[in-house]
């Protein structure tokens, strides 16, 4: 199965050298490719060649960089090269007189992240008069032609650009052909996504998941720490994913053909203004990448699973976390900026009892947190965080359920509706609120 790097900004290699051809500057690379870097001197009908020759060497034009033609009011049409694969953010934004794009490739790998490739152009103004404005194999914008409860994205669409479906707030049906969708593509109040027979997308409880490859830095921001991970990623989180102030990232999700797949992590993305105080990441999830919950200030309680292996430096930047529960079996090597924000807000950190002293004395960045801010998990998780236990209690850490009691001390065989007292095999005791989960 083909997987796709779900990152909506493609940056060319860093060995680029600039060279001008016919009033267009190109960045040249040692792999024989060229990117349009600056076309602000171009005028009228512009043709971007498929290949350019510099000092006897031929380069294939594969991309147009961010803002390359931005605010050029002199161009009226652009003919694209046959080998074009990437167009980055705002490449043609504010080109007010740009009306025609010719020789559009049948397939584009990436159309930027912010959805403003053709912002404030005649080309876009004309395109959005149609119900579905499609550029190459990307949906640029859906425009309602009347009231509809369900929007079906046409088959053959490879990618959905940012803001393409913001006018759809009920149900969206994704095509089998879809392999890429911006985290900003949808209305945050969208009620449901039908992924149908799509083999790489899945939707569960207000979260859109996508199977693919994500490249990120492991713990620190050095190239030697860069890793690429294949898996199923929590990609877009909608408002209805939050239940009673709690956002649960599940450990498993069902895809087409009733295939259950493990959720590998939460991808770099932007939350659509959720009102959420508590985040629970279920067992099985291994990665929380950079910016996954950045600027999410209402977040006060975070519960991390024992399976977690990596947190991005900026994963929780500016989230005013009061209580952080770390169920990992040993102090994870975390990045400096993650710990610095935990320290900044004087957060309480709850860890397994056996690791309490280890966290206080570790040589990792955890030692930046005052020793008095560490607490053992059993019996000390704050009341404000008890709702974290809405996830199946059998999946919390490696301990198993030994006995379940009601509040009045009566022993029962399974979780009852409401508050339960649960004794675990490791000797810990937990309060668990059951809102419908059945004992597995």
Features from the language model and the residues they span:
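Boundary at the C-terminal end of the N-terminal hydrophobic targeting segment
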Residues: 16-20
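Sec-dependent N-terminal signal peptides
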Residues: 3-12
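A structural signal for leucine-rich repeat
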Residues: 316, 337-342, 363
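C-terminal outer-membrane/trafficking sorting elements
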Residues: 386-440
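Structural signature of tandem-repeat unit edges
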Residues: 23-32, 41-63, 72-86, 95-112, ...
